[in-house]
UniProtKB/Swiss-Prot annotation:
Biological role stated in the UniProt entry: Class B beta-lactamase which confers resistance to the beta-lactam antibiotics, including penicillins, cephalosporins and carbapenems. Acts via hydrolysis of the beta-lactam ring. Has penicillin-, cephalosporin- and carbapenem-hydrolyzing activities. Has endoribonuclease activity, cleaving substrate RNAs preferentially between U/C and A, in vitro.
Keywords, sorted A to Z: Antibiotic resistance, Hydrolase, Metal-binding, Periplasm, Signal, Zinc
Binding locations of Zn(2+) 2: 99, 176, 215
First and last residue of the signal peptide: 1-18
Disulphide bonds in the chain: none
The protein's name: Metallo-beta-lactamase IMP-1
Cited InterPro entries: Beta-lactamase_class-B_CS, Metallo-B-lactamas, NDM-1-like, RibonucZ/Hydroxyglut_hydro
Subunit structure: Monomer.
Chain residues that bind Zn(2+) 1: 95, 97, 157
EC number: 3.1.26.-, 3.5.2.6
A single Gene Ontology CC term: periplasmic space
Organism: Serratia marcescens
Localization per Swiss-Prot or TrEMBL: Periplasm
SUPFAM superfamilies, per the entry: Metallo-hydrolase/oxidoreductase
Length: 246
């Protein structure tokens, strides 16, 4: 067997092992009528990354807040709730990255309504990705009147990041905007605007009972303060003159 053949066999096995080593989709009850779904993906430079989203139940209907990373896990998530008697009424994506939108194409193929802001759809189109079938504009949007509110605090992690507020439960899904322990991937971030956006979010939802970030543990409203501090720190660091290379 040639060295090249051995290399490709090793590469294939490594990829297969990495895929098999990803944890299974997790679905956990957070509050009455609110579930956290957690999917996992191998991300270059970051290793295996967990991503949280929500499923909100309104009577016999279920709404997805962000899809899992993949179509496969999105199908698993939908099936889990359908088997328990719920109709999947729609999905909303909090920004254009794949950890929020990876299941849109599968949902569209099943005629399940998908929602995103006009800006998110524009960014998806720019990237050659499948767009949500429904879009909205403005700072506020009610996915379900008095039950599921979407709010745009301004640019931060991405230009289009929105959060989702559940007023009856006082639960805020902050998604990838909430970064209490470090700003993470800054590839599409607006460092200059993030502190102002974070301050607005803190003032609006400072009495939230629970705050759900995308990539760290669920916490209380203190995560809003920590995110603001990280955003300010990131802005200050961006203003420091770079050290000359030797």
């Amino acid at each position: 067997m040639s060295k090249l053949s051995v290399f490709f066999i090793f590469l294939f096995c490594s990829i297969a092992t990495a895929a098999e080593s990803l944890p299974d989709l997790k679905i956990e009850k957070l509050d009455e009528g609110v579930y956290v779904h957690t999917s996992f993906e191998e991300v270059n430079g970051w290793g295996v990354v967990p991503k949280h989203g929500l499923v909100v139940l309104v009577n016999a209907e279920a709404y997805l807040i962000d899809t899992p990373f993949t179509a496969k896990d999105t199908e698993k998530l939908v099936t889990w709730f359908v088997e328990r008697g719920y109709k999947i009424k729609g999905s909303i994506s909090s920004h254009f990255h794949s950890d929020s939108t990876g299941g849109i194409e599968w949902l569209n193929s099943r005629s399940i309504p998908t929602y995103a802001s006009e800006l998110t759809n524009e960014l998806l189109k720019k990237d050659g990705k499948v767009q949500a079938t429904n879009s909205f504009s403005g700072v506020n949007y009610w996915l379900v009147k008095n039950k599921i509110e979407v709010f745009y605090p301004g640019p931060g992690h991405t230009p289009d990041n929105v959060v989702v507020w559940l007023p009856e439960r006082k639960i805020l899904f902050g998604g990838c905007f909430i970064k209490p322990y470090g700003l993470g991937n800054l590839g599409d971030a607006n460092i200059e605007a993030w502190p102002k956006s974070a301050k607005l979010l803190k003032s609006k939802y400072g009495k939230a009972k629970l705050v759900v970030p995308s990539h760290s543990e669920v916490g209380d409203a203190s995560l809003l303060k920590l995110t603001l501090e990280q955003a300010v720190k990131g802005l200050n660091e961006s203003k420091k003159p770079s050290k000359p290379s030797n």
